[in-house]
């Protein structure tokens, strides 16, 4: 289809009054996630229980760019942003339609309060986006737009999420994609056990989410046990704050729940849903 035809199809789809979509934060693993005996099934079961989205807005830990950037609005090649893996991981395809109407909605929601927005039309989906989407929406028939993390400041990211929250009432699934603990220097081999810092941070985060203790989550580096062991940098926890903002603005923090838990190579794969 031509760009103009894709735009018309997407606009019509988003004009249908849908139910409010949840907001998700998921741990996306790495390309070998597809070979795990359990994790792909957990992601597939999760998506099977969701309302069908009109479009998906992805915020991945693997794209930091300021000002906030909108990725491709038509199908372009994936970004294989990893090195040293077997060749078949570089042949994974996920040709989801672009989401130009969603991109325009994002521009309006963010620019109205004066937030600068830029377009990066050749930027495809990175592995933080497509690895989980392959398992959750394998037909690649839902339009997807990826946006960048414009900052790693948790409060500013929550504000971005709050501004994007109205999209949930237009059938848009907002997904923050990171990893609940992420310290690659301490990665364990399969079956190598779970390091204490990863288990402690995961338990703390689970309790903070259950208690809706947003202040503690915002200050995770100091409020949590082993915060900087769990996250030497903030980028894999950062997408959670966009999700929290989208949930908070819609009054859905009380409706949060963990959907996936456990560990993968010593890292916590906790994933949560609001609404």
What does each of the following model-derived ranges do?
Residues 103-157:
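Internal, conserved structured core segments that host functional sites
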Residues 13-117:
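A short aromatic-anchored loop/beta-hairpin motif
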Residues 108, 112, 143-144, 151-173, ...:
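Surface-exposed, charge/polar-rich loops and edge strands
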Residues 24-25, 81-88, 136-145, 218:
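Short, basic/glycine-rich phosphate-binding loops at helix/coil junctions
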Residues 1-4:
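Short hydrophobic targeting helices and cationic amphipathic motifs
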Residues 39-44, 88-92, 123-131, 157-160:
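Short acidic (Asp/Glu) patches
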Residues 60-63, 122-123, 172, 177-180:
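Short, well-ordered beta-to-alpha junction loops that form the rim of enzyme active sites
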